[in-house]
């Protein structure tokens, strides 16, 4: 019984490795949600190859930034153009969920609901572990 579970376990591990290694995104969203377009890259190294072909280095000016548009304190003066060396990192949310129509209270970590996520995980993983041992 125990010897037959080893090939199945290895097959599951190998299939998970294949799933994770080939499930990366090759389509990137550029700009904000209003003025956006998608860029497709044929491989994971396409962006690195593009950068090495154009030989970009630190402090290269890709486009000129006005002083009024720049909201940072650190600037360097290179030949008449301002080059932004540091900007605050503001990322838009990847997923925007609609608000709930009902006046439901917000979930909290205190009270009776604390720890239920671990119990659900334990309840789902224990039968799977027992199944793999049984094989």
Swiss-Prot record:
Invasion zone and early symbiotic zone. GO terms for biological process: nodulation. Residues 1-23 form the signal peptide. Keywords: Nodulation, Signal. Involved in the infection process during the plant-rhizobium interaction. This is Early nodulin-5.
